Every structure is written in structure tokens, then in C-alpha cells.
Regions:
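Short helix-start
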Residues: 16-20, 43-68
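Polyanion-binding surface elements
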Residues: 2-35, 66
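Major-groove DNA-recognition helix of helix-turn-helix-type DNA-binding domains
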Residues: 25-54, 70
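Non-membrane alpha-helical secondary structure
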Residues: 1-2, 56
């Protein structure tokens, strides 16, 4: 867990990120994210609330950490 990344995500997006925020942070197209969520292959857990799809900032941070570790290996 990177506290710097968590602090940055929380400051910029708040405690949860919508699909547009995820697209910006992960450098993915919104449609790709929606497709991966639909087929169950999106690497960050998401949930629906108030008609929108959300991801917790801690889960996004954990995914970014896994990516960083994979690049370092």
C-alpha cells in the first residue's frame, strides 16, 4: 500500500472513483472499463450506488501497487 498514492487519490477524487475517474487514472478507455466490468475481468472491485459504478480509492491504490510490483519483477 502506497500512502502517497492513497493520499493523492483521496485528495483528487475523494473516497470513491467513478468510471470516468478510473479511465483517467488507469489510462484506459471508459468503454473498455465498462466491458471488463461486465465480463468480470476488470482488476479493481467496483459497486453500484445511486445509478453509478464506483471503485474505492484503496482498491485502486492496491491495483496500482500490484502493477508497480509486476514492473519491478
Amino acid at each position: 500500500m502506497s500512502l502517497m498514492t492513497q493520499a493523492w487519490l483521496l485528495d483528487k477524487y475523494g473516497p470513491r472513483l467513478n468510471v470516468d475517474n478510473l479511465a483517467e487514472v488507469l489510462g484506459m478507455a471508459r468503454a473498455t472499463i465498462n466491458n471488463e466490468i461486465s465480463d468480470g475481468s476488470f482488476p479493481v472491485p467496483t459497486y453500484r450506488a445511486h445509478g453509478k459504478r464506483w471503485a474505492d480509492y484503496r482498491d485502486v491504490d492496491a491495483y496500482l501497487d500490484r502493477c508497480r510490483e509486476a514492473l519491478a519483477a
